[in-house]
């Protein structure tokens, strides 16, 4: 549970290549990975957050900071696919932004998290740092291709990781209990105006320890402010403008 490690992994990945491998470039990037990035969700939340996202900074641990948000993704994908359009049209097609691919920043963050690259291999406490990446074997085939592309990139970047496919039944158990390390699967709920049911699992009062079936979100991300908001939403009329 280390934010520097997670950001290091994120910045080590090249979303352009992953998108080409997953959707042949036709996917809409979702910088806030809670739900599927529908046009409604993007226009209601992501686009109004652009200033905040563009000014968001990471502490690299060496006295410098880094702004990880990348607004150039839509234009790059359009250029690579030979698609023309206004900025607004390209954002509708490809998304408002994603996170930068920057191996130098990724390296600093991983070192800040306690890892060290030895002879091209990432080590932790003197041993190669290993983890498993998993995806669903019998459904969500685009997501499987995305995980496979990410696995190839992280292996090239120096991680001795493994990759595994799981049945939906196995993932239902493992996801609920937190029995995974890095996993790829589709979120849902972004098409709904009232998506409380899709995010209610982030209520800190419902989160269970690892090994116990959790509240509906395998991340076990616990934030006091979010819990307060969810408690308020639980008692808000779905037809309310709020």
Locate the predicted segments by residue.
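Short, solvent-exposed loop/turn segments at the edges of secondary structure
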Residues: 1-3, 29, 126, 177-178, ...
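Append "and occasionally in soluble cytosolic enzymes with long acidic Gly/Pro-rich linkers
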Residues: 2-152
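Short helices/loops that flank or line small-molecule/ion binding pockets
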Residues: 3-4, 148-157, 169-180
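Extracytoplasmic/peripheral linker and loop segments enriched in polar/acidic and small residues
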Residues: 6, 19-22, 56-92, 99, ...
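Short secondary-structure boundary/capping segments
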Residues: 25-26, 36, 179-180, 198-202
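Paired acidic/hydrophobic, glycine-rich loop segments that form the ligand-binding mouth/hinge
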Residues: 181-186
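A ligand-binding cleft/hinge motif common to bilobed small-molecule-binding domains
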Residues: 189-194
């Amino acid at each position: 549970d280390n934010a520097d490690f997670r950001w290091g992994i994120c910045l080590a990945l090249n979303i352009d290549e992953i998108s080409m491998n997953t959707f042949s470039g036709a996917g809409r990037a979702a910088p806030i990975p809670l739900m599927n990035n529908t046009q409604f969700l993007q226009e209601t939340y992501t686009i109004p957050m652009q200033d905040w996202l563009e000014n968001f900074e990471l502490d690299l641990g060496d006295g410098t900071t880094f702004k990880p948000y990348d607004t150039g993704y839509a234009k790059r994908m359009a250029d690579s696919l030979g698609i023309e359009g206004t900025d607004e049209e390209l954002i509708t097609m490809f998304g408002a932004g994603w996170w930068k691919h920057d191996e130098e920043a990724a390296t600093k963050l991983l070192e800040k998290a306690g890892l060290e690259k030895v002879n091209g291999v990432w080590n932790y406490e003197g041993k190669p740092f290993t983890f498993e990446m998993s995806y669903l074997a019998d459904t969500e085939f685009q997501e499987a291709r995305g995980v496979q592309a990410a696995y190839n990139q992280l292996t090239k970047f120096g991680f001795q990781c493994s990759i595994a496919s799981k049945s939906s039944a196995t993932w239902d158990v493992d996801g609920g209990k937190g029995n995974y390390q890095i996993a790829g699967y589709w979120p849902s709920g972004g098409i709904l105006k009232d998506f409380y049911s899709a995010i209610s699992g982030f209520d800190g009062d419902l989160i269970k320890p690892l090994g116990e079936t959790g509240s509906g979100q395998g991340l076990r991300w616990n934030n006091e402010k979010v819990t307060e908001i969810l408690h308020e939403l639980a008692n808000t009329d779905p037809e309310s403008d709020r």
